[in-house]
Design a protein with these regions (language model features):
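Switch II (G3) loop of P-loop NTPases
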Residues: 1-28, 49-50
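Short, function-defining helix-loop hinge/capping sites that tune catalysis or transport
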Residues: 22, 83-84, 111
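Conserved beta-strand/loop subsegment of P-loop NTPase cores
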Residues: 13, 41-48, 65-102, 107
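Short, surface-exposed amphipathic charged segments that create phosphate/polyanion-binding patches used
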Residues: 2-6, 88, 111-118
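Conserved phosphate-handling catalytic cores of large alpha/beta enzymes
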Residues: 104-128
Length: 128
């Protein structure tokens, strides 16, 4: 199947909401990532909701850390008033935050992560 995508610059693989608690799904995700990494240059992104409780986020990132090194993408920034989890998780995982999403219009609402903008919002500043 990988050969079908050789001519593409980017191929996105979505695990369709696999649960980090389901060992079989985690194993299948690891096999998929391992296969892709053997045949192509790749980057792995762990997509997390900014509205998820911190304790749950910790369990998710711990479960996926055994699968692959990853960058973080946070969704639903427009649906939360607290952004501290972004910083806390970045520090906990040492993974870079690559992108954030602020709405449901794709791709318009996907932004490259801007640390200065996020710190401003964390400190009570307004989003322009």
């Amino acid at each position: 199947a990988i050969n079908d995508f050789k001519e593409f610059d980017y191929v996105f693989v979505d695990t369709m909401g696999h649960s980090h608690r389901n060992e079989e799904q985690r194993d299948n995700t690891k096999k998929l990532i391992d296969c892709i990494e053997r045949h192509a240059e790749s980057q792995c992104y762990l997509v997390l909701s900014a509205t998820t409780k911190y304790k749950d986020l910790l369990r998710i990132v711990d479960n996926y850390k055994v699968i692959a090194d990853y960058h973080l993408i946070f969704t639903k920034l427009d649906e939360t008033y607290t952004l501290g989890n972004l910083l806390n998780l970045k520090l906990y995982t040492n993974a870079s935050i690559a992108y954030v999403t602020c709405g449901q219009n794709v791709p318009e609402d996907i932004e490259v992560f801007d640390p200065q903008k996020t710190v401003k919002l964390l400190l009570g500043g307004k989003n322009n």
